[in-house]
Amino acid sequence: MRRFVVVGHRAVTTPKFSLNDLPGGAGRMDIIARCVNASLFLSHDLRRDVEFFAILLGEPTPPVTIKFSGEHVRYLSPDERSPAALIKKALERGIPVEGEAEATPGVYISKRSFADLINGMDNLVYLHEDGEDIRSVELTGNETFVLSDHQNLTPEEEAVLEAKGAKKVSLGKKLYHADHCIVMVNWETDRR
């Protein structure tokens, strides 16, 4: 199972956002939506062997983790509004006190923090421009790739990854959009 974890540092944790203003009023939820699509979509199909996690850290009640399961997700279309609408529905459903709850088929919501989520995962790969070139790294297809939205991970978040022994891997020396990084990782992994 391939996993992607994206931290949305400003992505709101309330359902009271407009699907017409994902970059502004929703705290860059547009980035999260594009990352969902980059993770899961193929031409005319979904990647059933991929899970996507968005850690929403915006106001008013961070953290909230939303999980999309490629195997089980329904009602997802390849546009920004569709995954954002599913996130909105999950937030409307409410955040469970413990564990995770299925909000819509294949979309789950929980109160897990970045540290909680990362500490429960293995084979961590931190995508960072200063890492080892991805083409020289052995990939099994069972990695968890961690990246951030338009902001860098905080030193505290990086410390969590370091404590778990995450490999720092680079897609190149340039900075790319998060969703583009996910497409490149999927392409690179598919070729092996």
From Swiss-Prot:
Main location: cytoplasm
GO CC terms in record: cytoplasm
A Pfam cross-reference name: Methyltrn_RNA_2
GO MF, one example: tRNA methyltransferase activity
EC numbers: 2.1.1.257
Keywords, comma-separated and alphabetical: Cytoplasm, Methyltransferase, S-adenosyl-L-methionine, Transferase, tRNA processing
Ligand binding (S-adenosyl-L-methionine): L127, C181
Coiled-coil segments: none
CDD domains: TrmY-like
GO biological process: tRNA methylation
Subcellular location: Cytoplasm
Gene3D superfamilies: 3.40.1280.10
Catalytic activity: pseudouridine(54) in tRNA + S-adenosyl-L-methionine = N(1)-methylpseudouridine(54) in tRNA + S-adenosyl-L-homocysteine + H(+)
Superkingdom of the organism of origin: Archaea
InterPro entries attached to this UniProt entry: Alpha/beta_knot_MTases, TrmY, tRNA_m1G_MTases_N
Listed transmembrane segments: none
NCBIfam families xref list: PRK02135.1
Similarity-based family: Belongs to the methyltransferase superfamily. TrmY family.
Assembly mode: Homodimer.
HAMAP family: tRNA_methyltr_TrmY
Its job: Specifically catalyzes the N1-methylation of pseudouridine at position 54 (Psi54) in tRNAs.
Protein name: tRNA (pseudouridine(54)-N(1))-methyltransferase
Gene: trmY
